[in-house]
């Protein structure tokens, strides 16, 4: 049985120390970033340079899309399969419980993804069940192999232009973050950055409909099951509803709440490709979206809808996703196979959509 631990606390770092500081301040921030990633796989950043107004508009635009009728969103639907996700995936399409079983060794066949009904006034929960989360994925504007599936401009004017602009801001920030990690890890300049150009990242816009808390208390349902992200790092902005938790690497099964302490703080977590680069020296953060603290104690509570925006920063598609030479030694041989970033993503995406592990030779 998992437990939520109030302590220790995810560290908060001031990004201005790196962006505007002297050599010593930049080094201290870079070292703090590495230390936070090694301990938790998570850090929070303030003064990150993305304005409050930009984040406000981001959430307004996310909500504007999800308020569209399903028939308009369906025009931009992502076709299930192992390819990188592009466009809208409706409730029930993606299932992180398949990743949950893979990563925790708990049989995934015993799990159900979070379900939502339509009549919360009813005391009965025996209604049609569907998966809880819907999301929309945006890829690189220059990606002609896997282009983003956009809604019609006439249905939501100006939306594509804003999202492409925000995507570019996220990519630029993440490249700076790679520079900081190179300093903190004592790697030669451009060791990490060079494998991220051209970009292969994705911007994901998430909406979690409201759900009766009773469905989340059973232990068989969750908004998102424990999982790790696919790429290098994830930048996350979330609303104040709560529920995001990260597993304490030092206490398996114990989860730390990642509550929003400041309205526009940025949450940054380590993802699976970065763990592979580091040969496991820095591990990807296992995290989930669980019942909110308030929902745990009120019998008939309804957990409100939740909004978030995640920038999945990734290596370019043909970059190697195996361990970097600096982290492979006779005492610590390579722990991961040296496939490309695209092959690794297809392997993971196929598992999410079909529950089947894609073989390396099938991923190309």
UniProtKB/Swiss-Prot annotation:
Residues annotated as binding Fe cation: 227, 229, 287
EC class name: oxidoreductase
Molecular function per GO: metal ion binding; oxidoreductase activity
Cofactor, how bound (note): Binds 1 Fe(2+) ion per subunit.
Region annotation Disordered: where it falls in the sequence: 73-92
Residues at which 2-oxoglutarate binds: 306
Keywords assigned by UniProt, alphabetized: Iron, Metal-binding, Oxidoreductase
Induction: Expression is down-regulated by ralstonins, lipopeptides produced by the plant pathogenic bacteria Ralstonia solanacearum. Expression is positively regulated by the imizoquins cluster-specific transcription regulator imqK.
InterPro entries, per the entry: DIOX_N, IPNS-like_FE2OG_OXY, IPNS-like_sf, Iron_ascorbate_oxido_reductase, Oxoglu/Fe-dep_dioxygenase_dom
Involved pathway(s): Secondary metabolite biosynthesis
Function: 2-oxoglutarate-dependent dioxygenase; part of the gene cluster that mediates the biosynthesis of imizoquins A to D, tripeptide-derived alkaloids that serve a protective role against oxidative stress that are essential for normal germination. ImqB is a canonical three-module NRPS that assembles the tripeptide backbone of the imizoquins via condensation of Trp, Tyr, and Leu-derived precursors. N-methylation by imqF and phenol oxidation by imqC, followed by cyclization via the FAD-dependent oxidase imqH carry out the three-step transformation of L-tyrosine into tetrahydroisoquinoline.
Protein family (similarity comment): Belongs to the iron/ascorbate-dependent oxidoreductase family.
Name of the protein this chain belongs to: 2-oxoglutarate-dependent dioxygenase imqE
Source organism (scientific name): Aspergillus flavus (strain ATCC 200026 / FGSC A1120 / IAM 13836 / NRRL 3357 / JCM 12722 / SRRC 167)
Higher taxonomy: Eukaryota, Fungi, Dikarya, Ascomycota, Pezizomycotina
């Amino acid at each position: 049985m998992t437990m939520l631990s109030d302590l220790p606390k995810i560290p908060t770092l001031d990004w201005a120390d790196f962006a505007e500081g002297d050599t010593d301040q930049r080094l201290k921030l870079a070292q703090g970033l590495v230390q936070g990633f090694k301990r938790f796989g998570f850090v929070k950043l303030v003064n990150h340079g993305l304005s409050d107004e930009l984040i406000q508009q981001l959430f307004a635009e996310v909500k504007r899309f999800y308020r569209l009728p399903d028939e308009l969103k369906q025009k931009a639907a992502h076709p299930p399969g192992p390819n990188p996700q592009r466009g809208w995936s409706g409730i029930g399409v993606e299932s992180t419980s398949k990743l949950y079983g893979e990563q925790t060794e708990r049989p995934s066949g015993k799990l159900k993804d979070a379900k939502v009904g339509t009549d919360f006034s009813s005391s009965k929960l025996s209604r049609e069940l569907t998966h809880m989360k819907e999301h929309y994925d945006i890829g690189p504007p220059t990606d002609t192999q896997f282009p983003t599936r956009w809604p019609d401009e006439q249905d939501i004017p100006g939306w594509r232009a804003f999202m492409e602009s925000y995507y570019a801001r996220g990519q630029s920030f993440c490249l700076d973050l790679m520079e900081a990690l190179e300093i903190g890890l004592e790697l030669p300049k451009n060791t990490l950055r060079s494998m991220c150009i051209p970009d292969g990242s994705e911007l994901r816009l998430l909406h979690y409909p409201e759900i009766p808390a009773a469905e989340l208390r059973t232990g068989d349902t969750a908004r998102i099951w424990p999982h790790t992200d696919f790429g290098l790092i994830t930048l996350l902005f979330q609303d104040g509803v709560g529920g995001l938790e990260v597993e304490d690497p030092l206490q398996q099964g114990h989860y730390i709440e990642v509550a929003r302490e400041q309205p526009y703080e940025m949450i940054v977590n380590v993802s699976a490709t970065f763990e592979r680069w580091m040969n496991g020296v820095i591990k990807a953060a296992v995290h989930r979206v669980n019942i909110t603290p308030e929902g745990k104690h009120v019998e008939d509570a309804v957990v409100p809808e939740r909004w978030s925006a995640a920038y999945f920063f990734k290596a370019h598609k043909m970059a190697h996703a195996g361990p970097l030479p600096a982290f492979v030694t006779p005492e610590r041989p390579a722990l991961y196979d040296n496939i490309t970033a695209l092959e690794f993503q297809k392997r993971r995406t196929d598992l999410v959509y079909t529950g089947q592990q894609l073989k390396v030779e099938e991923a190309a």
